[in-house]
From Swiss-Prot:
Its main location: membrane. It comes from Pseudomonas syringae pv. syringae. Contains two disulfide bonds. This is Outer membrane porin F. GO terms for molecular function: calcium ion binding; porin activity. It is a multi-pass membrane protein. Residues 225-343 form the OmpA-like domain. One of its GO terms (biological process) is monoatomic ion transport. PROSITE patterns: OMPA_1 (PS01068), OMPA_2 (PS51123).
Length: 344
């Protein structure tokens, strides 16, 4: 009677849960299963044949993968060596770990737990009890999101007798009440089609310049974009009668080089200057050496292409400060350069 009630409860739950469609896998799900098991008894037991077990289980998913399961089954068709019928029951508590994800068709599992077996001969008072430590595993195959079939095998170690028995099993079951499910990918949004008479990429209903010529870059309003001009200037100072670039000027030269690398279409002219001390011809040559020294730093130190850098000397012809004072002459001993480009 117990067995009939157990199987009836399992089958009834499967039918009811499937009918209402309130099934789900994953964390929080409840699992109901009916199963059949073949018990391969150890030779140390005084049994003539192996046993058939039928039962059911109920499980609860603590996470999407970890399930705690309570099972009950009854022993049938077992005879002792003297031909007597053997009857008994098993109660088991196992933890299962499932692989793959909730909603996948195949979810293999491994299990571990303990069971208590009470078994004895018909017509005799008293039964023998044994405690088992169990490990097992197998696959669950889902026919729908929640209705599945299972096959597995357990190794059952009899703690009381020190023997190991094997128990293959099959079952069918359902999961319901969980919260995790395969998330279907959202359909790609359909791009809105709008009229664009001048083909500038801006819809006519917001285009403030509807007749823009072809191949003209436009802003968000559909009007020709105004290019922003960006500029970098260089001003390198030199000691009297020297054309050696001082270490404290390398940072400014690098800034110019970085700008030219960012805008590879740019070129620059490096202009050398001197103060008024000395002959004009000497100062002209000195200014050219200064300009060339800065060019070499740009090219050799910072990798600017030589074809993009011109150098020219102006001698003392373009002062920016008073050459009558030492401070003014220090300002005039310089190299200047300027680069400008349209902002990206």
């Amino acid at each position: 009677m117990k067995l009939k009630n157990t199987l009836g409860l399992a089958i009834g739950t499967i039918v009811a849960a499937t009918s209402f469609g309130a099934l789900a896998q994953g964390q929080g799900a409840v699992e109901i299963e009916g199963f059949a098991k073949k018990e391969m008894y150890d030779s140390a037991r005084d049994f003539k044949n192996n046993g058939n077990l039928f039962g059911g289980s109920i499980g609860y998913f603590l996470t999407d993968d970890v399930e705690l399961r309570l099972g009950y089954d009854e022993v049938h068709n077992v005879r002792s060596d003297d031909g007597k019928n053997i009857k008994g029951a098993d109660t088991a508590l196992d933890a299962l770990y499932h692989f793959n994800n909730p909603g996948d068709m195949l979810r293999p599992y491994v299990s571990a737990g303990f069971s208590d077996q009470s078994i004895g001969q018909n017509g005799r008072n008293g039964r023998n009890g044994s405690t088992f430590a169990n490990i097992g595993g197998g696959p669950k195959l889902y026919f729908t999101d929640n209705f599945y079939a299972r096959a597995g095998v357990e190794a059952q170690y009899n703690i009381d007798q020190g023997d190991t028995e094997w128990a293959p099993s099959v079952g069918i079951g359902v999961n319901f009440g969980g919260g995790s499910k395969k998330v279907e990918a959202a359909p790609a949004p359909v791009a809105e089609v709008c009229s664009d008479s001048d083909n500038d990429g801006v819809c006519d209903n917001v285009d403030k310049c509807p007749d823009t010529p072809a191949n003209v870059t436009v802003d968000a309003d559909g009007c020709p974009a105004v290019a922003e001009v960006v500029r970098v200037e260089l001003d390198v100072k030199f000691d009297f009668d020297k054309s050696v670039v001082k270490p404290n000027s390398y940072g400014d030269i690098k800034n110019l080089a970085d700008f030219m690398q960012q805008y590879p279409q740019t070129t620059t002219t490096v202009e050398g200057h001197t103060d008024s001390v000395g002959p004009d011809a000497y100062n002209q040559k000195l200014s050219e050496r200064r300009a060339n020294a800065v060019k070499q730093v740009l090219v050799n130190q910072y990798g600017v292409g030589a074809s993009r850098v011109n150098s020219v000397g102006y001698g003392e012809s373009k002062p920016v400060a008073d050459n009558a004072t030492e401070a003014g002459r220090a300002v005039n001993r310089r190299v200047e350069a300027e680069v400008e480009a349209q902002a990206k």
